[in-house]
């Protein structure tokens, strides 16, 4: 038994010394509002309603998740127990106050910006998530655990103008009071009231967003008003003033919102000789400067001109350098990796995109990662991914099973799905609840069923076997960066080796107790090896190795340091 323990300690201690690499990162993507409610006192703000009487109607209201709740889970070790390297939180910026028509013109539920995709004010935190002090404590805690922090960045569009925002900031005449505007008015149509009219001029204004009367090409992704949202004029180099409604908003708030205003953004609330994109980039980069944010997932990448992404990347790298220099006592100040950028590019796979790499992207989200959990063919998919990693320096796949727009994975086979993901080359992104069996809600019956994919994390209904599996493989992955960044030799349909110099791991899928695993050419006879998932050891004999048992259709084999040959 002592030998087994020593072997395991040697393997994990040696691996733990290796530096973090984004190419092997395990990213935990969490919708803050749906994860954990740590403070019920911040659940209702800005005149919003949170309860319309049924689960279907409440599908897209704010549900109470916040920084305090996430901090509590971080302190419990929830993320470190899964080997998480990066926590990706949905955007923390203040969201539109009112609701948008759910399912578009159908309007079968009120749709709020709980998910962070509908920004109103980039200079302060949404009160539903928590305060600046609470966010700082969360980021600092994650950094102290060796975990990077990602947020979202969107240069394409602000949030929708809504009835409630129009009433509160007076940019359009609605005929409603604030209380009435917060009701779910089924007969109200965004398409008729805002999208085709010029009230946008009172929202962000003609200099900032494309107006319906300007004749833009709706078939051109760089000009289209995506899902009817106002579209920033990212091609414009014309100087603009900060939108009048924002100036009015800040004047109305005075110092009342100081607990939520990003200190590094306060100086950016003045008119400059800037284009719309310059304001946006400065506002977004200020979160890096203030909190040491380590990366961004950029939204709808192909809808924004590449030069703007390049400018954002440069601004964020400068801001991160400034933060590290200003916080020498913070463990994250010693990190040397550059600011990380990935993004959603519609239907992207693992293909290398040199223009985006030159703009500062290290990956684009891989929409085509297999989500069925079929372990009979995944080795060949892994081979293609590993070959791509080897061919393109600092570019790697960003793989996922589920995300906020898709629940494509076989939820009845998440053990094998988790194996396919967590042993894949490149980034492995776990969507909150993938590891626990988080269930859908009645919102799946709405026309816009996406809201059902974003259900609340139910901490009283955890699939313990599934969670244990994600934890085991996640920790193995974190301790062995070669899994994500190494080259691959495929031996057969179920067996491959990841290697980087002398660092080597053999992966065997669907192993059988009665069938020895062939390791000839990888581990010499007499080498003591450990199967990391079950922590069993064995000695290689006649080019083969056997273990008394296997669990969950996987074996991860590595040589013990004291007998490597």
Predicted regions and their residues:
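Active-site-proximal helices and loops of the catalytic beta/alpha 8
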Residues: 186-192, 197, 282-400, 411-412, ...
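The substrate-binding groove and active-site-proximal loops of carbohydrate-active enzymes
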Residues: 53-68, 116-131, 228-277, 294-303, ...
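Aromatic- and acidic-residue-enriched segments that line the glycan-binding/catalytic groove
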Residues: 23, 44-48, 95-116, 155-249, ...
């Amino acid at each position: 038994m002592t030998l087994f323990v020593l072997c395991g300690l040697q393997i994990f201690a040696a691996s733990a010394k290796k530096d973090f690499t984004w190419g092997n990162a395990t990213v935990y993507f969490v919708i803050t509002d749906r994860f954990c409610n740590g403070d019920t006192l911040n659940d209702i703000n800005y005149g919003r309603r949170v309860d319309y009487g049924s689960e279907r109607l409440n599908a897209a209201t704010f549900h109470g998740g916040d920084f305090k709740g996430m901090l509590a889970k971080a302190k419990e070790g929830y993320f470190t127990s899964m080997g998480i390297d990066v926590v990706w939180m949905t955007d923390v910026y203040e969201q539109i106050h009112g609701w948008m028509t759910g399912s578009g013109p159908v309007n079968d539920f009120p749709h709020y910006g709980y998910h962070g995709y509908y920004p109103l004010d980039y200079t302060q935190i949404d009160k539903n998530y928590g305060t600046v002090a609470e966010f700082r404590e969360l980021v600092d805690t994650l950094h102290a655990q060796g975990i990077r922090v990602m947020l979202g960045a969107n240069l394409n569009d602000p949030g929708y103008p809504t009835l409630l925002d129009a009433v509160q900031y007076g940019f359009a005449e609605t005929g409603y009071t604030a209380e009435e505007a917060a009701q779910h008015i089924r007969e109200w149509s965004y398409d008729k009231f805002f999208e085709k009219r010029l009230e946008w001029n009172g929202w962000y204004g003609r200099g900032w967003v494309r107006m319906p009367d300007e004749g833009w090409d709706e078939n051109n992704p760089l000009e289209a008003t995506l899902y009817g949202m106002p579209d920033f004029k990212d091609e414009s180099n014309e100087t603009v003033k900060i939108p009048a409604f924002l100036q009015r908003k800040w004047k109305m708030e005075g110092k009342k919102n100081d607990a939520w205003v990003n200190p590094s953004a306060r100086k950016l609330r003045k008119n400059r000789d800037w284009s719309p994109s310059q304001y946006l980039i400065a506002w977004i980069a200020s979160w890096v400067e203030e909190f040491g944010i380590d990366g961004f997932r950029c939204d709808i990448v192909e809808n924004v001109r590449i030069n703007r992404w390049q400018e954002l990347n440069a601004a964020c790298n400068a801001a991160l350098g400034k933060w590290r220099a200003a916080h020498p006592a913070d463990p994250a100040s010693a990190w040397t990796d550059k600011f990380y950028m990935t993004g959603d590019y519609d239907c992207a796979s693992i293909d290398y995109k040199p223009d985006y790499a030159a703009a500062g992207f290290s990956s684009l989200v891989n929409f085509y990662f297999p989500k069925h959990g079929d372990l009979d063919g995944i080795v060949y998919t892994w081979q293609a991914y590993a070959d791509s990693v080897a061919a393109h320096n600092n570019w790697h796949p960003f793989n996922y099973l589920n995300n906020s727009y898709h629940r494509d994975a076989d939820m009845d086979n998440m053990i094998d799905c988790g194996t396919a993901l967590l042993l894949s080359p490149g980034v492995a992104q776990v969507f909150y609840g993938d590891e626990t069996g988080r269930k859908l809600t009645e919102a799946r019956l709405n026309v816009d069923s996406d809201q059902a994919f974003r259900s609340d994390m139910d901490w009283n209904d955890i699939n313990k076997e599934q969670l244990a599996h994600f934890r085991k493989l996640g920790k193995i992955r974190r301790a062995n960066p070669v899994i994500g960044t190494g080259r691959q030799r495929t031996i057969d349909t179920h067996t491959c080796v990841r290697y980087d110099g002398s660092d080597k791991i053999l992966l065997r899928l669907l192993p059988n107790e009665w069938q020895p695993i062939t390791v000839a050419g990888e581990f010499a006879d007499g080498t003591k090896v450990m199967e990391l998932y079950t922590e069993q050891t064995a000695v290689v004999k006649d080019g083969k190795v056997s273990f008394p048992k296997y669990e969950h259709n996987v074996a991860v084999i590595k040589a013990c340091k004291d007998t490597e040959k």
